[in-house]
Amino acid sequence: MKILITGGAGFIGSAVVRHIIKNTQDTVVNIDKLTYAGNLESLSDISESNRYNFEHADICDSAEITRIFEQYQPDAVMHLAAESHVDRSITGPAAFIETNIVGTYALLEVARKYWSALGEDKKNNFRFHHISTDEVYGDLPHPDEVENSVTLPLFTETTAYAPSSPYSASKASSDHLVRAWRRTYGLPTIVTNCSNNYGPYHFPEKLIPLVILNALEGKPLPIYGKGDQIRDWLYVEDHARALHMVVTEGKAGETYNIGGHNEKKNLDVVFTICDLLDEIVPKATSYREQITYVADRPGHDRRYAIDAGKISRELGWKPLETFESGIRKTVEWYLANTQWVNNVKSGAYQSWIEQNYEGRQ
């Protein structure tokens, strides 16, 4: 099987590419614009494979994407290319509209025209797999807001959309486009919505890598508000395995939620990281002493949590990592890969971190 992957140099995309090349016989065509979060070093251990191909291109460039489709003749598309950081979407939403909405439209149109011209067998087996987020659903009741006896709800595949940030609104828009292209044109699409990912090769603007690296550098560990926001954490390699299972075994027209069964308050996540660092690289005082509280994000969702029962029942997928095992692997990876970290932390990234976090104190 030949799979065209957009955004394959990003955090989740590179995990998918590594998984496919290392664990299957499928061929990958990786399309990536290589924006700040795209890093080919994340693919260095598979880049010489004769089943791996890289194309430096923008999904908004329809002519170039058409050329790539015609050259490689993919059997499936896995669409991961996206702007994905909520804070960046608040200060600069235009890039999110362009990539996540306009880019998805452009890719859908190229894929639709390509699919329409395929022979019957290849046409029937083709899949356009759109990878999305649980943030499109908005947020869920927080334990602080309900009585102890009440069972807290989870996001399911039929939860109504209620995005609350420019990022989640742009992803919700792209989800709707994908489903419309199936209903209107018959394009065999699948949508997956995932919870918060973590693991190796994560760009250090996100909570877990930011805390690990700031802790090691003796910098403040910024916590939004009281740190009581709850997220479900999914180890990225578990997610990659699920995504490949969906594109190869999932049913066209379906939606699958993918979660890690690990609801944690942000502050507890930071405590766990600090305690691991105290154990692995101890210093005179606990890393917890570096925690600092900053002004909360505007419109910050209080709780996300996914019901991943459907993908478990229908495809047999379950996460292999607990949060405790996955976060230990993640911390150990960052300790062992300082060169990768140094290479991605450019001057532009440092300026953004200073503006976004230090300006909130």
UniProtKB/Swiss-Prot annotation:
Keywords: Lipopolysaccharide biosynthesis, Lyase, NAD. GO terms for biological process: dTDP-rhamnose biosynthetic process; lipopolysaccharide biosynthetic process; O antigen biosynthetic process; polysaccharide biosynthetic process. Substrate binds at residues 84, 133, 196, 206-207, 222-224, 231, 266, 296-300, 357. Pathway: Carbohydrate biosynthesis; dTDP-L-rhamnose biosynthesis; Bacterial outer membrane biogenesis; LPS O-antigen biosynthesis. It comes from the Bacteria. Pfam families: GDP_Man_Dehyd. Binds 1 NAD(+) per subunit. NAD(+) binds at residues 11-12, 32-35, 58-59, 80-84, 99, 167-171, 197. Its cofactor is NAD(+). It catalyses: dTDP-alpha-D-glucose = dTDP-4-dehydro-6-deoxy-alpha-D-glucose + H2O. CDD domains: dTDP_GD_SDR_e. Coiled coil: none annotated. NCBIfam families: dTDP_gluc_dehyt, PRK10084.1. Catalyzes the dehydration of dTDP-D-glucose to form dTDP-6-deoxy-D-xylo-4-hexulose via a three-step process involving oxidation, dehydration and reduction. Belongs to the NAD(P)-dependent epimerase/dehydratase family. dTDP-glucose dehydratase subfamily. This is dTDP-glucose 4,6-dehydratase. It comes from Salmonella typhimurium (strain LT2 / SGSC1412 / ATCC 700720). The gene is rfbB.
